[in-house]
C-alpha cells in the first residue's frame, strides 16, 4: 500500500472517529436531559427547563459538527462498504437525536404543570420518563459496539411507552368535569412530546439493526 493510500486511510479513520464520538456524545447528552427531567419530576424542581435547554444546545452543536464532517468525508474520502454504511447511519440518525432533544425541551416546559395536577396522570408519566431514559441508555449501549439485540430492546421498551401514552391520552381526553382546560392541554402536549421522543430513538435503533443485518456488497463473502 502506498504512502498516499495509508495517509488517506488514516484521515478517513480520524474523521470516522470524530463523527462516532459526537454521535455517542449526543446520545449521552440526551440521556442527561432525561435524567434531569426524571429527577425534577420526582423532586418538583422548577429550574430543570434551563438545564434541559443547555444540554439541547450541546446536542445541536454536535449535530452541526457531524453534518459538516460527514459531508466532507463523503465528498473527499469516498468511503465504501462498512465505512460508508456507518457514515450514512450517523448522518441519518443525528437529526433524530436532535429532534429527541427538542422534545425533551417540550416536556421540560410542561413538567411543573403536569406534576402539579392530576389531569396528566403524574405517576404514569414518571413511568414513561423512566422508560425513555432506559431507551436512551440502551441505545447508547447498542451503538458502541453496535449490538442488534440491544437495538431491538429499544423498540420493545418503546412499546411500553406507547401503551402508557395510549392509556393516558384516552383518560386525559375523557377528563374529569372539574379538570381545567389548560391543564388538560398541557398534559396532552407533554405526553405527545414524550411519545415522539421515544419514536426518534426507535428510528436510530432500527437503522442499527439494519446495518448489522445486511452486509454491504463488498463485505459479503465471495
Curated annotation (Swiss-Prot):
Coiled coil: none annotated. Keywords: Cytoplasm. It comes from the Bacteria. GO terms for biological process: intracellular phosphate ion homeostasis; negative regulation of phosphate metabolic process. Belongs to the PhoU family. Not known; probably involved in phosphate transport and/or metabolism. This is Uncharacterized protein DR_A0161.
Amino acid at each position: 500500500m502506498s504512502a498516499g493510500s495509508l495517509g488517506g486511510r488514516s484521515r478517513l479513520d480520524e474523521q470516522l472517529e470524530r463523527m462516532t464520538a459526537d454521535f455517542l456524545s449526543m446520545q449521552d447528552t440526551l440521556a442527561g436531559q432525561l435524567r434531569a427531567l426524571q429527577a425534577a419530576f420526582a423532586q418538583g424542581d422548577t429550574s430543570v427547563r434551563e438545564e434541559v435547554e443547555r444540554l439541547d444546545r450541546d446536542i445541536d452543536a454536535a449535530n452541526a459538527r457531524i453534518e459538516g464532517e460527514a459531508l466532507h468525508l463523503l465528498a473527499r474520502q469516498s468511503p465504501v462498504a462498512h465505512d460508508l454504511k456507518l457514515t450514512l447511519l450517523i448522518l441519518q440518525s443525528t437529526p433524530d437525536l436532535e429532534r429527541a432533544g427538542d422534545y425533551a425541551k417540550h416536556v421540560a416546559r410542561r413538567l411543573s404543570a403536569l406534576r402539579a395536577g392530576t389531569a396528566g396522570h403524574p405517576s404514569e408519566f414518571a413511568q414513561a420518563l423512566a422508560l425513555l431514559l432506559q431507551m436512551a441508555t440502551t441505545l447508547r449501549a447498542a451503538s458502541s459496539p453496535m449490538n442488534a439485540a440491544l437495538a431491538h430492546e429499544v423498540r420493545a421498551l418503546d412499546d411500553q411507552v406507547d401503551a402508557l401514552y395510549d392509556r393516558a391520552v384516552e383518560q386525559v381526553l375523557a377528563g374529569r368535569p372539574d379538570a381545567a382546560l389548560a391543564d388538560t392541554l398541557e398534559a396532552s402536549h407533554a405526553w405527545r412530546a414524550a411519545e415522539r421522543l421515544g419514536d426518534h430513538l426507535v428510528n436510530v435503533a432500527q437503522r442499527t439493526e439494519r446495518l448489522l443485518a445486511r452486509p454491504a456488497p463488498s463485505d459479503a463473502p465471495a
